[in-house]
């Protein structure tokens, strides 16, 4: 009898052990839908979140904002700062099984620099050429010294894609992207979901514990949270500050936040097509008046529960790059009215487009009320975020509210938005003196010299005001208690390597 019991137990155990282990699937609620899934062409913040899982970069950014190895294991600058040599990780495969090597890096960088649709051109404008110095070594030769290049390569400009897929798909690469990250593309249904699955040949696969990840765009923060609370989602990004207390009080959920390195802003159409031909786009005094009509501290308290900070520059007030000679202005409606009178207007109608998420809409409703006192009649146009960015690009807007998630080097918060040929200069503002200052800041290895250049540029921009900076918010996440290993980073990314979903 004992022998029979042992045999039965052994057979039962064998049958159980033969059953497949339940796949760990992670469902993440995003505030917006990503735009095109091509690192060369895209510009959305949520797109970068998806790329963090799908497309490894030459280098990454640590939570303390240091540049760290990823596809490149080491790098060195020439003494004159005119060449950057990078050694690549051995044995890395793209999702299509082809090798990630020096030739692939060269092909990707050249694609970023030459593809007509590429938004990476201004980020790589200092690069004269990139060459393979061996199977796993590349050399970037520069036109002039550029201390920002490493930071650029820690983002979309440094995401290496399969040359075979890029050549086959061309500008349609985003329909079936092939990269070298921990997860590979499965499917996308716009405005519904993006699905990725674990790449079994990933170079760091032993630290990937999730088998499948689904990103679901849910613009309404209340609905996002409700889906998390019901268990339909495992994690959400950009939790509304008003919901922070509810998450902290829920024993089944985990809360995480960190102050970001980006900004919230209004972009004025200065010279981007026919819609720039209006008083607000043509007269800086009206833009200055609009800015003075806004109480940034009140915005922080009303909309962000005190978790944000007011701002008037691309760098937050606690940043070493902030120009202290231009403090965040207090609200001054009378001065705003004076500027409007000086410009010859009592009232000015403005159409302001805003993404269709509750926090952004609430913020713009408060702004709408504030600026009305000075004489601005604002009508709000709500639209899906990717559509909003497309309208900005095409110049089909008058004033547009958008965020920038920030970059580890100050250049990333200003150059591409403001320079005459900037890759995402939707305002089409162009001032050769600003270009000169920002290009010189890129070329200097002396932070004190760079600070002087940024300060001088900020004085001009604070007067011309093509972008009206509103402030700097915190990134806030919420997740199920069984999701562990998440590290909050000031860049707002959700890095899935090392993250686990416990049974």
Predicted segments — roles?
Residues 27, 101-108, 135-141, 181-182, ...:
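Alpha-helical secondary-structure segments
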Residues 29-79, 110, 175-179, 478, ...:
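N-terminal lobe/hinge region of extracytoplasmic solute-binding protein
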Residues 66, 154-208, 212, 333-334, ...:
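Gly/Pro-rich hinge or "lid" segments in bacterial periplasmic/extracellular proteins
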Residues 73-118, 133, 139, 224-227, ...:
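Aromatic- and charge-enriched surface segment that lines or borders ligand/interaction sites
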Residues 76, 87, 121-164:
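Surface-exposed binding/hinge segments that line
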Residues 189, 198, 256-264, 293-321, ...:
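Detector for C-terminal structural segments
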Residues 201-246, 368-369, 377-379:
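Ligand-site clamp/hinge motif
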Residues 275, 309-342, 359:
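Structural transition elements
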